[in-house]
Each structure stands twice: as structure tokens, then as C-alpha cells.
Amino acid sequence: MNNMDVINAFPGYEYIDGKNIYRGDDLGKGGYVYAEPGMYGNVALLDVASMHPNSAINLNAFGEYTQNFKDILDTRIAIKRGDFDKAKHLFGGRLAKYLDDESSAAALAQALKIAINSVYGLTSANFDNPFRDVRNKNNIVALRGALFMRTLQDEIQKRGFKVAHIKTDSIKIPDAT
């Protein structure tokens, strides 16, 4: 993982006294959270699909094994979208035999989600494990997502929309057109 590449993609980011400062906000160490209290109508809820797993892939967090992680993620997404033919050929076809009965596909997608999120979580665990990179002192995968969501907030507000809420990988925009 090259932290400098992540940081350079977001000009203005600073690590000051153990804090992730970007555009005047302390982003914390996990997912970015923002709220404008109030009651809203006609709220668009937008979700960044698999944000942390995709960040891990883009950061090449698992070195030579990153492609396997990506294949598992792509398989899960194909199953979730009902594209079973595609899913049967992904990940070297290893999961094809579990996709003959499409009624059990949701359970397989959920099992893959648990595996994917567990692996991501272990990248920043406080204990030694095969997925933890000791150089990752700042949870770089979550930081990349937080920087992206904070940038997205500014871009949406710049276009005249209110941002009511952000939580890690989702954003709520009242009266979105």
C-alpha cells in the first residue's frame, strides 16, 4: 500500500497530531460521518457499492492476492445482480457448482459479503494476522473512503444541493432532482 498515492489524490489532506484533516474537518480513523439535523422529504439515498473492498483493491492491499479478493467481490456483485451466468465464470469458476440452484444464491452472496468484509476488517486490526500490514497505521482503506465521501459532499453542495447525512459509504440528499 502506498499511502502517498492516496494522499496525493486528495490535495489539501494533512495528518496533524494523529488526526486526518481534510478541508477543515477531522475525518477520524474510520468512515466519514456528517449530519445536518432536520426533517427532510424526497430524500435520495445513494450508496457507494463495496467502497472499502474496492479501495483495498485499488490500493493493492493484498499484493499478489489482490486479484483473488477482486474476483470474490466481482462474483458476489454478479450474484447479487442476478447475473448467474457471469458469476459461474468468475473466480476461475470455483463457485459455479454452488450456483446451480439460484434459490440459494442469496445465501452464497451473503457468505461472500461476510468473507470480504472480514478480510477488509482484518487489514486494520490491532492484532497480528495474515491480512494486516504493519505499515498501515492510519487505516488507509477507510481513509481513502472518507476522503472520497468528503470530496463528494463538497461537489454536491457546490451544485446547490443540501447534504443531510453521510455515513461511511452512503449519502442522503433532500430534494434531489
Could you describe each region identified by the protein language model?
Residues S55-I57, P174-T177:
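A short acidic (Asp/Glu
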